[in-house]
């Protein structure tokens, strides 16, 4: 909580305003974005005080985005507990999320670099462009191509990765270009999340079963199923229903398996894993990033 208080120092006010935000912090996530920042510092070698501020900024922006995502997606659970807006209401949750975004921008100013704010705004714009077009597809019922999906994902999921890297580069002597690696990681994280949402038991325990189907989301396996079987409209009709019926969702999962959509997704994940490792090696190797990639391979046990 200390790191969230604004410069006015009104702790009592902030405690009230930030209740929806601190609520989701009671069950910490995997801190993967903070781990990535520390991993990239193997190459960038910036001072710890700057690294810690960047890590705080990324975590604040990530967690605030989760509050908004859960409202936009009509989610029920987040990290195994009821979503914040089901406890504190939509209005307070939106305000808390927006407030934390500006607290994060205020923290960017503390980095005391003339380009830091511009970098932050650039990447937040990219993130919202990616998030926005994904919502547009869902709400207008337009199934994107895989290439359109990948561009959206690099903007949305890769946006915070690039924000961390670009902020760190402001204080580094390294001139390495990490754009390709950040894009690969963004794709890998999102496609892995799409796959695990439909296949991995622990996702069902922390969210509702196959939540992406209830949301009506054009996730990577869904896009493959719809695009590869244009004459079979079962999957797209199930998606249109935004169903909470577990039996219907289980049937959709069997269709995705039958259509080869899970197999295609696993092949894509394996390819992204290879590409990430090759890019890490090209950049000189990084044991911390390699360890993160190893940890992410839990999707492979769902075969």
From Swiss-Prot:
Classification via CDD domains: Trans_IPPS_HT (cd00685)
Binding-site residues for Mg(2+) 2, renumbered to this chain: 69, 73
Listed GO MF terms: hydrolase activity; metal ion binding; prenyltransferase activity
Keywords on record: Hydrolase, Isoprene biosynthesis, Magnesium, Metal-binding
Cofactor requirement: Mg(2+)
Segments passing through the bilayer: none
Chain sites annotated for binding Mg(2+) 1: 69, 73
Enzyme class: hydrolase
Pfam family name, one: polyprenyl_synt
SUPFAM superfamilies recorded: Terpenoid synthases
Cofactor note: Binds 2 Mg(2+) ions per subunit.
Catalytic function, reaction form: (2E)-geranyl diphosphate + H2O = (2E)-geraniol + diphosphate
Enzyme Commission number(s) of this protein: 3.1.7.11
Disulfides per UniProt: none
Motif DDXXD motif boundaries: 69-73
GO terms, biological process: isoprenoid biosynthetic process; pheromone biosynthetic process
Family: Belongs to the FPP/GGPP synthase family.
Domain remark from Swiss-Prot or TrEMBL: The Asp-Asp-Xaa-Xaa-Asp/Glu (DDXXD/E) motif is important for the catalytic activity, presumably through binding to Mg(2+).
Role this protein plays: Terpene synthase that is able to convert geraniol diphosphate to geraniol in tea leaves.
This protein's name: Terpene synthase
This protein's encoding gene: TPS
């Amino acid at each position: 909580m200390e790191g969230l208080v604004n410069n006015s120092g009104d702790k009592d006010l902030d405690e009230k305003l930030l209740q929806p935000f601190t609520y989701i912090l009671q069950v910490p996530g995997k801190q993967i974005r903070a781990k990535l920042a520390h991993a990239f510092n193997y190459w960038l070698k910036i001072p710890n005080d700057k690294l810690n501020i960047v890590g705080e900024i990324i975590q604040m922006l990530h967690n605030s985005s989760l509050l908004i995502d859960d409202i936009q997606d009509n989610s029920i659970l987040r990290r195994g507990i009821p979503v914040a807006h089901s406890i504190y209401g939509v209005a307070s949750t939106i305000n808390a999320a927006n407030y934390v975004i500006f607290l994060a921008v205020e923290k960017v100013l503390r980095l005391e670099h003339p380009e830091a704010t511009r970098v932050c705004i650039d990447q937040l714009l990219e993130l919202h462009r990616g998030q926005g077009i994904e919502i547009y597809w869902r709400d207008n019922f337009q199934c994107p191509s895989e290439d359109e999906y990948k561009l959206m994902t690099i903007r949305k999921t890769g946006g915070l990765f690039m924000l961390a890297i670009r902020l760190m580069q402001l204080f580094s002597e390294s001139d390495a270009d990490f754009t390709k690696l950040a894009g690969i990681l963004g794709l890998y994280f999102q496609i892995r999340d799409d796959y695990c949402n439909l296949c991995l038991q622990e996702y069902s325990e922390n969210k509702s079963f196959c939540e992406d189907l209830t949301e009506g989301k054009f996730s990577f396996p869904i896009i493959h199923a719809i695009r590869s079987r244009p004459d079979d409209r079962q999957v797209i009709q199930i998606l249109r229903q935004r169903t909470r019926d577990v039996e219907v969702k289980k049937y959709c999962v069997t269709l995705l398996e039958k259509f080869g959509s899970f197999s295609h997704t696993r092949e894509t994940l394996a390819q992204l894993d290879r590409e990430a490792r090759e890019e890490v090696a090209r950049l000189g190797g990084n044991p911390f990033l390699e360890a993160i990639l190893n940890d992410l391979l839990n999707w492979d046990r769902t075969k």
